[in-house]
Amino acid sequence: MAWLDPLNAYPLPADFASKAEAYSTLLLTYNKTHNISGAKTTQAVEENILDSLYPLLFMEAWPNRCIDIGSGAGFPGIPLALALPQMEVHLFEPIAKKSAFLHLVKSELGLTNVVVKTERIEATEAFPCALICSRAVTNTKALLSLAKAFITPTTCALLYKGSRANEELEGFSNYTLFERNQRRYVLVKELM
């Protein structure tokens, strides 16, 4: 699939393309009725998948457990779960129709490494987590405050931000910023 060419440097699982296509079809179908995403075309879904997976090209290592806060239609959590089947991905989405979609995707694609939680991150029982991901939820300080019970001395945050990322990072010292188009990917280490 040509749209995956930007990820050629990363060895995706053999079933990735077929599962990504199935995810795209499910999202476009569900979205017609339930309006859970701004992605209304195959091309838009593919771009959201690429956006979700771009960190594969710069992350040095991936942990065994990740939480995605405010998963919405599944970005970035579902694409990361497809690309990294060895990683347990917990999707936190409090809005019922979006969470129902995430449950559907998990079931239809047989994603045994995905756990869907229909609740806010601060309302759930915390567990140690090596990576916190989030895209378009809230500002960095507020997000990390919401997730504080999950943070250990080795927890990192991978945040998908827009053009104002630098403003949100004031006061943080141990982070790396990567850019692709209008997206700023922020990897924050040593959260404690």
Features from the language model and the residues they span:
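Short capping/connector residues at structural and topological boundaries
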Residues: 41-42, 50, 83, 126, ...
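Conserved SAM-binding loop of SAM-dependent methyltransferases across substrates and taxa
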Residues: 73-86
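Class I SAM-dependent transferase core
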Residues: 1-63, 67, 97-100, 104-114
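S-adenosylmethionine
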Residues: 86-90, 94-192
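Residue-level preference for alpha-helix termini and adjacent loops
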Residues: 35-36, 49, 74, 120, ...
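Conserved beta-strand/loop positions that form the S-adenosyl-L-methionine
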Residues: 69-71
